[in-house]
UniProtKB/Swiss-Prot annotation:
NCBIfam families: PRK10792.1 (NF008058), PRK14186.1 (NF010783). One of its GO terms (biological process) is methionine biosynthetic process. PANTHER family: C-1-TETRAHYDROFOLATE SYNTHASE, CYTOPLASMIC, C-1-TETRAHYDROFOLATE SYNTHASE, CYTOPLASMIC-RELATED. Signal peptide: none annotated. The keyword Lipid biosynthesis does not apply. NADP(+) binds at G166, A167, S168, I232. Pathway: One-carbon metabolism; tetrahydrofolate interconversion. InterPro entries: Aminoacid_DH-like_N_sf (IPR046346), NAD(P)-bd_dom_sf (IPR036291), THF_DH/CycHdrlase (IPR000672), THF_DH/CycHdrlase_cat_dom (IPR020630), THF_DH/CycHdrlase_CS (IPR020867), THF_DH/CycHdrlase_NAD-bd_dom (IPR020631). CDD domains: NAD_bind_m-THF_DH_Cyclohyd. One of its GO terms (cellular component) is cytosol. One of its GO terms (molecular function) is methylenetetrahydrofolate dehydrogenase (NADP+) activity. This is Bifunctional protein FolD. Homodimer.
Length: 286
C-alpha cells in the first residue's frame, strides 16, 4: 500500500478534546453545560448502537445527554409533541432524532419541526439553505466531518476536481456544497450517471457515499488522488467494508480513509461540535 491512511479515529479524538475544552471553558464562566436530546423510536439494533455511541461521546465531552427512548408504536403526533417540548426546553441546545424511524412514521415533518437553531444534524431546510448561500451555521455532520479530514492533510482545494459519488440529502448533496465553498471544481455522480469510471478517474478528491460495497474499483482511481470512503457496508461474514475497493485503491491514491475508522468517528465528533456551537453562538443568552 502506497497511500497514507487518514486516521479518522485520531482526528475525531482531537476534535472531541477541543469540544471538551470548550465545555469546560463554559463551566469556568459559570455557564451551563450544552445539552443534546437524543430521541430513539423502537428497537432497531443498529440504531441502538449508534445512539449509544452518541450518548457516550456526549458524556465524555461533558455535554448533558438527555435520552428519550420511545416504543416502536409511538404515533406521529406523540413524536411531534416531544419535538415541540424539546424545542422550548432551554437546557436543550441540540435535538437529534435517530433515523431510520419505524415505517409508520414520516421523518420529513419531524425533521422540519426541529427548530433550526437546535438542528445539530444539519438536516433542516433552513440550515441546508444557509449552506447553499455560503453562510453555513449548523452543517450536516458527515460532510463537515469529511472537510475536517481533508483539512487535516492540507488539501489544496482550489484548482482540484472533487467528484462525489452519491447524491443523498444526508451526504452527497451537502458534500458538494462544502467542497464548492472550499473552491474545488465539483462533480456529483448518481444512479443516472453514465461512465462512472471516467469521472472517478478524473477526481483529485474522491468522496464515495453510495452504500454499495466495492462499487468504486481501485484501478479507476487517479494516481495521487485523495479517497474518502463514506460507505459502511456489513458483509455476510460480519465484517465492515466501504464503497471503494480499498486494497487496489490504496496502491494508486496518495491518501485514503479506512472503513471502519475513517469517516464514521468524524460524524459523531462533528455532532458534538455543532452542539457546542449552538450553545455558544445560537443560544448565548440562555
Amino acid at each position: 500500500m502506497s497511500a497514507k491512511l487518514i486516521n479518522g479515529k485520531e482526528i475525531a479524538a482531537q476534535v472531541r478534546q477541543q469540544v471538551a475544552a470548550g465545555v469546560e471553558a463554559r463551566k469556568q464562566k459559570g455557564l451551563r453545560a450544552p445539552g443534546l436530546a437524543v430521541v430513539l423510536v423502537g428497537h432497531d439494533p443498529a440504531s441502538q448502537v449508534y445512539v449509544g455511541n452518541k450518548r457516550k461521546a456526549c458524556e465524555q465531552a461533558g455535554i448533558l445527554s438527555l435520552s428519550y427512548d420511545l416504543p416502536e408504536d409511538t404515533s406521529q403526533a406523540a413524536l411531534e409533541a416531544l419535538v415541540d417540548e424539546l424545542n422550548e426546553n432551554p437546557a436543550v441546545d441540540g435535538i437529534l432524532v435517530q433515523l431510520p424511524l419505524p415505517s409508520h412514521l414520516d421523518a420529513d415533518p419531524i425533521l422540519v419541526k426541529i427548530r433550526p437553531d437546535k438542528d445539530v444534524d444539519g438536516f433542516h431546510p433552513y440550515n441546508i439553505g444557509r449552506l447553499m448561500q455560503r453562510k453555513p451555521t449548523l452543517r450536516p455532520c458527515t460532510p463537515a466531518g469529511v472537510i475536517t479530514l481533508l483539512d487535516s492533510i492540507g488539501t489544496p482545494y482550489k484548482g482540484q476536481h472533487a467528484v462525489i459519488v452519491g447524491a443523498s440529502n444526508i451526504v452527497g448533496r451537502p458534500m458538494s456544497m462544502e467542497l464548492l465553498l472550499k473552491g474545488a471544481t465539483t462533480t456529483v455522480c448518481h444512479r443516472f450517471t453514465d461512465n462512472l469510471e471516467k469521472f472517478v478517474g478524473e477526481a483529485d478528491i474522491l468522496v464515495a457515499a453510495v452504500g454499495k460495497p466495492g462499487i468504486i474499483k481501485g484501478e479507476w482511481v487517479k494516481p495521487g488522488a485523495t479517497v474518502i470512503d463514506v460507505g459502511i457496508n456489513r458483509m455476510d461474514d460480519g465484517k465492515l467494508c466501504g464503497d471503494v475497493d480499498f486494497d487496489a485503491a490504496a496502491e494508486r491514491a496518495a491518501y485514503i480513509t479506512p472503513v471502519p475508522g475513517g469517516v464514521g468517528p468524524m460524524t459523531i465528533a462533528t455532532l458534538l461540535e455543532n452542539t457546542l456551537y449552538a450553545a455558544n453562538v445560537l443560544h448565548a443568552d440562555t
